[in-house]
């Protein structure tokens, strides 16, 4: 086997593994940092093998298109958040995942040259979505509990553990399953692709995700209007036949569920007509989201230019809660601190500022302007593909106006893959072959090599830092060498505050055993450094309050506790450390 053939095979194997892992990462039982490291490593290896295959083939370089160029600009700005984030500990995972998305897009641009290859991997992605739908439906019967998670209040979640996450994933793939059904030429493919959309609709119904069901309705309406506009009566007929079949299957499954021994949280299934009443009514969720959105607006106003860095919303939320939401915050303030703003545009604005939001909007404009161009000028079959592809991306974006299932659950990778598919069709069928001029060969190869080197260095550093923090420092397995471990962690992430916080925690523990004032001085010195690195991490106030308590400075200790308890997690931590017989376990 030649080098070119080996690189070609390895690239496709890596892409296959990446597509499967991005959909089923929860099944592998990896910790968050481990799954992030693995998927970014797969993207890096895919880019490297694609570059080797590309260079040995001596094929003509694709020009950098408007869609891919605008997305890489946005992802690049998010990666630069390393330099403007208010907390590197909270941002480093999201930054690396943004980098992984850019790396995947570059690898796809190098490797996928044939529409046949693109269709093959789309088939794989849709098969993964169909299988997830089967799992979501089977969840209702609570069988195979060793491999299929139990539902929460009869709400299907797939392997994701949350109904809205499942809904986002399925909505991203649903329209394409319909396209592949109508475009399939063999009976076997038609049967498989005919089953997939039915399963996805049933899974979305059983998920009880109101937002997901609403977006599904919008997608179905768009598809029906498209078929009517095409005057394709056979497809309109098939559309209504499928809806009838789904209805029959749904009530049949409900009947079987009632006959089973599954404990039902509801005496009757929640009806879509009860969207504004009952326990799962939309008003409470909407009120919560208004708080999230207005709090995000408050953060954006203070950090409007560059934002606070990816993944920092949860950290700043307690500091801004109530400033912008005085009329909504009552009864909410101490319920939960959300991990994100539940809106992709607000989240991008708070994370990356007006610069990042502007780049993302430019990317969306590029996607829809080129999509509209293809719908008007491409051959008929390509127009169909572009319509359903654009509808998939649109469904994802609409659902993410009330969610933010993008970075924290690896959905950036299937999103990037579908964006590339549209980009591929644009490059193939546009009369104007390039919106951006071709790049010099030396610069082209140099930039890609730099991406690989920087990505590899960043991924290795990230893994080493996270492994030290979560495997040795926080669990206390390396207490004897804690100073050495924290110093090593600081070399991997000089701007991170967690090593200093853990060192402070250890010094306070030492003081409890040996009340030496010098130990408190050392602990306070660590906290001063932490305050410079991560000023919004309220854990430092818990530790500083303990130091002030040891020093009998009760007034200042009380003020520090009050400030820290704005965060519900810190309230629980502070209570545990005050009342527990072993505060080091808190």
Ranges and model annotations:
Residues 510, 514-517, 551:
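Structural motif corresponding to the intra-repeat A-B loop/turn of tetratricopeptide repeats
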Residues 27-45, 340, 347-363:
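Membrane-interface anchor segments at the N-terminal boundary of transmembrane helices
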Residues 134, 139-142, 204-207, 212, ...:
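A membrane-periplasm/extracellular boundary helix in multi-pass inner-membrane enzymes
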Residues 58, 86-90, 113-114, 141-148, ...:
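Transmembrane helix-loop junctions in multipass membrane proteins, especially transporters and channels
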Residues 1-80, 86-93, 100-127, 179-194, ...:
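Transmembrane signal-anchor hairpin modules in multi-pass inner-membrane enzymes, especially those
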Residues 2-26, 39-52, 72-83, 94-107, ...:
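Alpha-helical transmembrane segments of multi-pass inner-membrane proteins
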Residues 144-157, 263-287, 299, 310-350:
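Interfacial juxtamembrane loops and adjacent helix segments
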């Amino acid at each position: 086997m030649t080098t070119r053939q080996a690189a070609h095979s390895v690239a496709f194997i890596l892409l296959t593994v990446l597509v499967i892992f991005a959909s089923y990462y929860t099944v592998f039982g990896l910790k968050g940092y481990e799954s992030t490291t693995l998927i970014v490593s797969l993207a890096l290896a895919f880019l490297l093998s694609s570059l080797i295959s590309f260079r040995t083939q001596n094929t003509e370089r694709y020009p950098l298109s408007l869609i891919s160029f605008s997305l890489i600009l946005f992802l690049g700005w998010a990666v630069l958040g390393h330099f403007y984030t208010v907390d590197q500990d909270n941002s480093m995972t999201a930054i690396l995942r943004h980098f992984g998305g850019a790396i995947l897009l570059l690898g796809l641009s190098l490797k996928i040259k044939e529409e046949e290859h693109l269709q093959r991997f789309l088939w794989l992605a849709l098969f993964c979505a169909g299988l997830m739908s089967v799992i979501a439906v089977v969840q209702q019967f609570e069988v195979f509990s060793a491999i299929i998670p139990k539902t929460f209040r009869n709400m299907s979640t797939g392997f994701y553990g949350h109904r809205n996450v499942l809904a986002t994933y399925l909505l991203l793939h649903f329209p394409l399953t319909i396209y592949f059904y109508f475009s399939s030429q063999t009976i076997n493919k038609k049967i498989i692709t005919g089953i997939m959309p039915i399963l996805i609709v049933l899974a979305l119904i059983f998920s009880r995700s109101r937002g997901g069901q609403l977006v599904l309705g919008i997608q179905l309406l768009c598809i029906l209007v498209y078929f009517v506009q095409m005057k394709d009566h056979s497809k309109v007929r098939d559309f209504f036949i499928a809806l009838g079949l789904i209805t029959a299957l749904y009530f049949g499954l409900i009947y079987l569920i009632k006959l089973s021994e599954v404990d039902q949280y509801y005496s009757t299934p929640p009806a879509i007509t009860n969207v504004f009443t009952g326990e799962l009514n939309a008003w409470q969720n909407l009120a919560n989201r208004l708080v999230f959105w207005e709090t995000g607006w408050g953060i954006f106003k203070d950090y409007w230019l560059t934002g606070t860095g990816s993944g920092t919303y949860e950290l700043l939320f307690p500091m801004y809660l109530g400033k912008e939401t005085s009329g909504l915050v009552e009864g909410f303030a101490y319920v939960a601190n959300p991990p994100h703003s539940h809106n992709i545009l607000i989240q991008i604005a708070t994370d990356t500022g007006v610069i990042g939001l502007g780049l993302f909007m430019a990317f969306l404009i590029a996607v829809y302007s080129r999509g509209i161009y293809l719908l008007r000028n491409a051959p008929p079959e390509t127009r169909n593909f572009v319509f359903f592809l654009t509808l998939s991306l649109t469904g994802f974006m609409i659902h993410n106006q009330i969610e933010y299932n993008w970075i924290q659950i690896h959905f950036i990778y299937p999103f990037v893959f579908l964006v590339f598919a549209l980009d591929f069709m644009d490059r193939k069928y546009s009369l104007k072959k390039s919106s951006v001029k071709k790049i010099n060969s030396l610069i082209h190869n140099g930039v890609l090599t730099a991406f690989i080197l920087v990505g590899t260095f960043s991924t290795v550093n990230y893994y080493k830092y996270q492994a030290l923090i979560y495997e040795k420092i926080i669990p206390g397995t390396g207490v004897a060498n804690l100073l050495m471990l924290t110093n090593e962690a600081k070399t991997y992430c000089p701007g991170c505050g967690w090593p200093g916080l853990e060192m402070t925690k250890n010094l306070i523990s030492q003081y409890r055993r040996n009340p030496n004032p010098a130990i408190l001085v050392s602990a306070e010195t660590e906290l001063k450094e932490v305050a410079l690195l991560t000023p919004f991490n309220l854990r430092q106030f818990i530790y500083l309050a303990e130091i002030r308590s040891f020093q009998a400075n009760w007034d200042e200790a009380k003020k520090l506790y009050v400030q820290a308890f704005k965060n519900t997690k810190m309230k629980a931590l502070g209570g545990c450390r005050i009342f527990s017989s072993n505060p080091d376990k808190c």
